[in-house]
Amino acid sequence: LLEKCWEKFEQYKDSDTTFNLKDHLWTLFLYEKGVFKIPDGLDDDTIYDGCNCGNCHFIISAEGRLMACRRFDSYVGTVNEELYDVFHGPKLNRYRQHERFEKCAQCELLRFCRGCPAVAFGYSHDFYSPDPQCWKQIG
């Protein structure tokens, strides 16, 4: 299915329409096709792309609840708290433990992908379990 979508994206790449490859597994797909290459000289501790849960945002619900991700119950605070403290606090930090990703921690795309931890959570009730949509064989 991704291959068919990619063919359409390529067919219409010069049109005025921009196609967003938002799903994180596009990174793996494009990596395997040789379109995406991991740049040399990157910092090993930096997250460059992929799921942003815990990394650079949180969600504010209509009720003022702060969530690490909109796709599963990931409460980290409220808008009544100091946002700096919430962002750097232990509740949000638990989503930043990238070495805990069971499968992704061993993958060269860890800093660019990580699949969808919310899908993994929905499937296994474990945020750090493998995204069941990921086809990459590790090890």
Model-based region annotation:
Residues 104, 131-139:
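Short Fe-S-cluster ligation motifs
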Residues 1-40, 65-115, 121:
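C-terminal accessory region of radical SAM enzymes
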Residues 56, 117:
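Gly/Ser/Thr-rich beta-alpha loop segments that engage phosphate groups in nucleotides
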